[in-house]
Amino acid sequence: MTYMKLTAAKRIVFFIYLFVIQFWKNASFQTKVS
């Protein structure tokens, strides 16, 4: 039970991490262009 919760939490954190990196890249790219 706890193992499944741990893997699910890791997966959620990983997706949030990727989303933040893509958002940061887009923001920095837009500021560079403008």
From Swiss-Prot:
Name of the protein described by the UniProt record: Putative protein YmiB
Organism: Escherichia coli (strain K12)
GO cellular component entries: membrane
Membrane topology, as annotated: Single-pass membrane protein
Transmembrane segments: 7-24
Presence of the UniProt keyword Transmembrane helix in the record: yes
Localisation: Membrane
Gene behind the chain: ymiB
Keyword match Membrane: yes
Alphabetical UniProt keywords: Membrane, Transmembrane, Transmembrane helix
Primary localisation category: membrane
